[in-house]
Amino acid sequence: MGPEGDLVAARLARGCRCFAVWMDGQVAGYGWLSTGPEWIGELQLEITPGSAEGYVWNCVTVDAHRRKGIFRSLLIGISEIARRDGLKRLWIGSVAIPAEKAVGSSGFQPALHFTTVTVGGLHAMRMTARDPKLSQDAGRVLRVQPGWYLRRSRRRRH
């Protein structure tokens, strides 16, 4: 089940939903959708989606299926189901260039840009706004505003 297999039951118990793309009888990719607080390890921040909002996270494409549009298909599927279930906005982050291309072509718009580095137990982060209205809303769910941040690095498994 992979390195995070032991976390699946806890995620499902707190209301997270897991989605998968299947090809030839095997999982080609998967991702999670949460409407409650979640830890974003790359940013060292917690996101708390608002009412009728969700957070798409921990999306993975199996190596053998990379560059086949799996991630984009996953995002479109999650978005359609979330909309059907009454969610009005989804938040997602990306730390990889190929993923960023899929995020944009799946209907997501950039709100914030992050530059981060972790060295010697410290986490430095610079956050800049991409869209004034979206960045204000993103700051609300992340409880931060554009600028520089320096904090102790924290590792959390969730």
Residue map of PLM features:
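Conserved active-site alpha-helix within GNAT-family acetyltransferase domains
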Residues: A96-F114
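Conserved catalytic-core motifs of GNAT/GCN5-like acyltransferases
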Residues: Q109-R126
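Conserved GNAT acetyl-CoA-binding A-motif
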Residues: A82-V95
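Conserved acyl-donor/pantetheine-binding loop and adjacent beta-alpha core of acyl/acetyltransferases
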Residues: G5-N58
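Non-catalytic positions within long, well-ordered alpha-helices that form the structural scaffold/packing
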Residues: E80-R83, G104
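Conserved glycine-rich acetyl-CoA-binding loop
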Residues: V62-S73, D85, K101
